Amino acid sequence: MEPKASCPAAAPLMERKFHVLVGVTGSVAALKLPLLVSKLLDIPGLEVAVVTTERAKHFYSPQDIPVTLYSDADEWEIWKSRSDPVLHIDLRRWADLLLVAPLDANTLGKVASGICDNLLTCVMRAWDRSKPLLFCPAMNTAMWEHPITAQQVDQLKAFGYVEIPCVAKKLVCGDEGLGAMAEVGTIVDKVKEVLFQHSGFQQS
């Protein structure tokens, strides 16, 4: 995938694939990234790419991700001089929808505060708010129940972003309660719903 090759607004949907950019952060739910990407690729007419934080890399193998995978190093390797492309801007132009799954507590706090210190948060800070952005919170129950979490989630919603709520279950740490990322099937169904609402996109 070469995001700089074409501008999404320049080509009708019927002539090209719909571009979904998946952001993945450092929650243990990042273990589900290979399954999530696989299920998204099952939707006809979708092209998928992934932006990862460095901490998220701990939870999956790049060999299990069958699409282009971008990380912080790519931002700086691509840009050498003033005329070179800026990756986070090219990615926000390329993508028709941004799905952040999982969105950990750290990145939630950064985005709510406007901090952009890695490739993913730069994409989110530069995001075109006329395009859908979906986020899937995932964190320990104690972190989820902290009062600041609700404030930060509300802030993202105020930006126009769509929450795919976390669920209650036994977490990897052994605690039981709210904070687990929504199931992959739920996430994929929501992506389909939003694609249809925003573009009239239909599976062939």
UniProtKB/Swiss-Prot annotation:
One of its GO terms (biological process) is coenzyme A biosynthetic process. It catalyses: N-[(R)-4-phosphopantothenoyl]-L-cysteine + H(+) = (R)-4'-phosphopantetheine + CO2. Changing C173S: Loss of activity. Pathway: Cofactor biosynthesis; coenzyme A biosynthesis; CoA from (R)-pantothenate: step 3/5. GO terms for molecular function: FMN binding; identical protein binding; phosphopantothenoylcysteine decarboxylase activity. Binds 1 FMN per subunit. Its cofactor is FMN. Signal peptide: none annotated. FMN binds at F59, D104, A105, N106, T107. It is an enzyme of class 4 (lyase). Its EC number is 4.1.1.36. The keyword Cytoplasm does not apply. It comes from the Eukaryota. Gene3D superfamilies: Flavin prenyltransferase-like. One of its GO terms (cellular component) is cytosol. InterPro entries: Flavin_trans-like, Flavoprotein. Substrate binds at N140. Homotrimer. Catalyzes the decarboxylation of the cysteine moiety of 4-phosphopantothenoylcysteine to form 4'-phosphopantotheine and this reaction forms part of the biosynthesis of coenzyme A. Belongs to the HFCD (homooligomeric flavin containing Cys decarboxylase) superfamily. This is Phosphopantothenoylcysteine decarboxylase. It comes from Homo sapiens.
